[in-house]
């Protein structure tokens, strides 16, 4: 199984994402918020891919995405931004920063499966 990191301050959303990824055959770890995520990532965690929320208190997902794309061991890790913010400007911003895709909440198993196929984790 491949390990995914889910970063979302909403426990219900994070747990639902985890369940969907488990159904697709992936082991998951969850960071309930940006502080927990930064602790895990700074501690050397290098997941196979990351599901990242944007709107979180404190350090938001945009800042985390920037960090992911500056850290040498995290640069190649695919990032799927999963957010309720469906503004075209947000999509442009996260894609420019290096996200692999943006999924609008509520995420579906089909949307996750499509994102995983793009990065060749699923056929």
Describe the residue ranges of each PLM region:
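Charged docking surfaces used in two-component/phosphorelay signaling
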Residues: 15-23
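Short hydrophobic/Thr-rich beta-strand motif most characteristic of the beta2 strand and flanking loop
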Residues: 25-32, 40
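Active-site residues of response regulator receiver
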Residues: 53, 83
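Active-site beta3 strand of CheY-like receiver
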Residues: 45-51
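Receiver (REC) domain active-site loop signature in two-component systems and cognate sites
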Residues: 56
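C-terminal output helix
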Residues: 107-116
